[in-house]
Amino acid sequence: MGKTAGEIYSEMEEYEDNLAIETLNRIYLDKVINPYRKSKKIIDMHTHTNYSDGDLSPQELIRLAIDKRIGTLAITDHDTIEGIKKVNRNEDIIVDSGIEIINGIELSAKTDKGRMHILGYGIDLNNKALNKKMIDLRDNSINSVLSIMEQIKRDYGIRFSYEDIKELVNANHNLGRPDLAKLCVKYGYATTYQDAFDKYLIDAHNKTRQTSKGLQYQECLELITNSGGIPVLAHPKSLELSEKEFLIILKEMISCGLKGIEVYHSSHSKEEMDYYLEIANQYGLLISGGSDFHGKSVQPDIELGTGKDKNIKIKKLSLLDKLHK
């Protein structure tokens, strides 16, 4: 079996000799990039890096996308654009492969139950209002995590050191429950991230979420639209609404500027995808889809590009057609 893009590129990084680097670059081009350019490619419009709650750096994510024969990749970190900014500055990009990278974000909206996330595609990363809001959301993420830490200390006697807290507050990414799950595993309070969520973090989050200073969905839609982006409702299944309730909120969101819906997602069954596709067509919404890939330690059963148990394989989306116009 041939080496992956990541393995070859890691070898290149170990060399300081220019000739060795040039040789490895040729190997990388021949063994990875050229076959990638000739291959039939798929689309993944929902991914996360370590700038939010993913495992991989933007560079590592793009390498993996090349290995997975992904032709279009949207980086949609939670409530931050720092990861995609790094890609756009070419500070964290590998040898040009022709892969298409879409500017994206996933904003969290306040909701009484379930989870409401709104994806934004094609956003202007230099938009002043967007960047100001990112600072506010960064501060909110710190306060939210500190509230959850206090809750699990009260409920379960779990305490983390001052150094752990200091490291979290000074991290270069928005904080979230996976950061706490990592600490729970580190100190033996849980065996896996999911174990930490099941034992402590879901309950603590539910107890503290009402004090959250999250955005209303109207503000999410406005923020994305005003930054030149296209707002899309992410994984609608996570709203945990009845069909009647879902259609009521969907119509309200459309009236406030919602333009698309994530039909294809790792958590959706075939029947659910068919239903959301019908809804998209009925209400004139753009169709999107993606794996919602976070990485192996966060979601070990979800693969980049193909989702859970290969339940998605996207080759065409009306959302992408709109972005290309």
Language model features: what each stretch is:
Residues D139-E167:
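Conserved phosphoryl-transfer catalytic core
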Residues K85, L146-R154, K182-V185, E222:
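A broadly conserved amphipathic alpha-helix scaffold signal in soluble, globular proteins
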Residues M1-G114, I202-D203, L215-V298:
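An N-terminally biased module of ancient metal coordination in phosphate/nucleic-acid-related enzymes
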Residues N172-P236:
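Conserved acidic, metal-coordinating active-site core of Asp-based
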Residues I81, N170-P178, K270:
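An alpha-helix initiation/capping motif
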Residues K110-D136, N140, K186-N206, E303-H324:
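Active-site gating loops and adjacent loop-to-helix segments of metal-dependent hydrolytic enzymes
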Residues H78, D124, I135-L146, A171-N174:
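Short, amphipathic alpha-helical segments
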